[in-house]
Amino acid sequence: MRIVRLANFVAPRSGGLRTALRELGAGYLAAGHEPVLIIPGDRDADEQTGQGRVITLRGPRVPCTGGYRVLLRRRRITRLLTELRPDSLEVSDRSTLRWTGRWARRHGVRAVMVSHESLAALIGMALPWPGPARILADRLNRATSRAYDRIVCTTGWAAAEFERIGARNLTRAPLGVDLDTFRPRRPQARDGVLLVHCGRLSPEKKPQRSLTTLASLRAEGLRARMVVAGDGPLRDRLERRAAAEGLPVTFAGFLAGRAELAALLGSADVVLAPGPAETFGLAALEGLACGTPVVASAESALPEVVGDAGASVAGEDLSAGVRAVLARPEAARRAAARARAERFGWAAAVRAFLVVHGARSAERTSA
């Protein structure tokens, strides 16, 4: 089966979505299918990779996103889809690619929309009025539900906005984690508590909450420091705040090496996941796989993923959750974190997504 996938907001230095696309594509390929990924970039390209064929089309930068690009060349994309003749279409975008569902229906192609974000949550951050924000999100989600054969959500939290409008084509399929790369390390003796914030430093991720948490813990007398792994438009502001408040924060930037990231996550006492609009949280799951408990925003989907292997806290300050986690014996909390992550292997995620595409796991690639 030829599965053509389209996505926006994917860059060499992006995180969760890029990881999900890579792992799912590699899984489709290993199962005997032909995945083709179409993404935006600074120039056109076409290459064979470990996740199958990847076609990059030149697309403009989106202001205030730290370099993300989108696909806008609709005629070019239409010609490309016609040439590729997909058996199934998988779209990981709800902005400039919403029209692809209608194209697929006209051409008799199965179309799947993967919801990697909550429109209700994102619009709610942009609009100060909950009522209009919800009405707008519901209107857009109804249009999406009508345009695609299946809507895939990775958690119940992500699915809630589609359940609210009565969408009948909704499917739950979790993402996964590389349990071999992200694994527990031998504990290292050190002085104090190490917190790690791993994620894009952008407004919707609320990274300032991690600094607030660190400041609260230190004000209570806890010897804590933090490493921030990630980059984005808020980095300069966060660095200035940390310096002004005298907070011991190391800004490591984007870590391209997965082994390097795994080593950092495994060395931490707690991973912070403060974003209120996270629909799954791959970085948090990678922390769990390394045996590190996660303290997450109670407003997000992370409580579903983390379970009892961490804590969830509402509001700007996650310090109460950190204290609760640190009160548990270290060996027990690390074992619980790893056990939780082992429920989310990529093999199971690939199988679930192939079911949505109507594909058999051992089907041979189409000619």
Give a label for each model feature.
Residues R186-S216, V227:
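Conserved donor-binding/catalytic core segment of Leloir-type glycosyltransferases
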Residues P293-A296:
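Short hydrophobic beta-strand element within catalytic cores of glycosyltransferases
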Residues P276:
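Aromatic "clamp/platform" in nucleotide-sugar-dependent glycosyltransferases that forms part
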Residues W157, G176:
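Carbohydrate-associated surface elements
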Residues F254, A263-A268:
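Short alpha-helical donor nucleotide-sugar binding micro-motif in glycosyltransferases
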Residues D236-L255:
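Nucleotide-activated donor-binding/catalytic signature segment of Leloir-type glycosyltransferases, i.e.
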Residues A331-G358:
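A charged, aromatic-enriched C-terminal amphipathic alpha-helix characteristic of glycosyltransferases
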